[in-house]
Amino acid sequence: MASAPVDPRVCSIARTLDIVGEKWALLAVREVFLGNRRFDEMVHRTGAPRDTLAARLRTLVAAGILERRQYCEHPARFEYHLTDAGRDLYPVILTLMRWGDQYLADDDGPPLVLEHRCGHRLVPQVICQACGDPVHHGESKTAES
């Protein structure tokens, strides 16, 4: 039997997508993870329209995902840094990257390969925090909170 529909106003996925569900928002977060914290770097590396990227950065700052830090007074210039909430998006970014690498990479392979500190290629997976087993579709169910 299917579960009851989830009210989109109280769904954590819908709420999250309201903030990061737009292409330029997640690409801005990706850039900060990669160490590109300045607006002009982000515009150059993402190809985002300046006004659109500026709007997404304002949203991410207002949501507490990024924070602005001034690095130059004259003229005033800012860098963007991840907050704890922003750093918690790292598994999301990695999982999206893994999916894209698996289903959308061209013949040359993925455009960016990450290596774990152990020296092996990083292949992220979702695991159960309690038992450490990988989590697969169909192995979880909704529970009362």
Description of each model-found segment:
Residues 39-71, 75:
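Canonical helix-turn-helix DNA-binding module
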Residues 29, 37-42, 57, 89, ...:
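Extended, folded domain segments that form the structural surfaces/walls around functional sites
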Residues 101-145:
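C-terminal regulatory/oligomerization modules of transcriptional regulators
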Residues 11-52:
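N-terminal helix-turn-helix DNA-binding core of bacterial DNA-binding proteins
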Residues 45, 79-81, 113:
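Short aromatic/hydrophobic contact patches that present stacked aromatics
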Residues 21, 72-95:
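Basic, amphipathic "hinge/linker" alpha-helix immediately C-terminal to the N-terminal HTH DNA-binding motif
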Residues 26, 63, 92-103:
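Alpha-helical linker/hinge and terminal dimerization helices associated
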Residues 1-8:
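N-terminal intrinsically disordered/low-complexity leader segments
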